[in-house]
């Protein structure tokens, strides 16, 4: 099946999230994933977060592999947290949001039935078997 990647910033996240992850939308059978990441530097195409730079290729590889082996499409909403000072602010919207309560990036969340069904934090997001467990969790 296919992987649809959608990028969002703090400013436009809610519009993308509401469209792609509506609570009553689970019937269409898509695997819905949120990936919270550090912003990229335009000149290097790398993020300011070393963990994100290591984990991203692993996550994309495992998501693509899962989509090929499933009969479901995958939606991957990549949410960029901002620059380092913005992310470090304890009042960052995604740190405070009870749906996410982010403590680090990258964070991968599988979304089902209007809530986080599986989650992988920054300390394990680079491990292929852990990514597989989140991506392939039964819904």
Swiss-Prot record:
Keywords linked to the UniProt accession: Disulfide bond, Electron transport, Redox-active center, Transport
GO molecular function: protein-disulfide reductase [NAD(P)H] activity
Highest taxon in the source lineage: Eukaryota
GO cellular component terms listed in the entry, alphabetical order: cytosol
Residue ranges of domain Thioredoxin in the record: 1-136
Pfam families from the UniProt entry: TXD17-like_Trx
Residues forming the catalytic site: 49, 52
Disulfide bridge map: 49-52
Keyword NADP set for record: no
InterPro entries to which the protein is assigned, alphabetical: Thioredoxin-like_sf, TXNDC17-like, TXNDC17_dom
Family the entry assigns: Belongs to the thioredoxin family.
Protein purpose: Probable thiol-disulfide oxidoreductase that may participate in various redox reactions.
Name of protein: Thioredoxin-like protein Clot
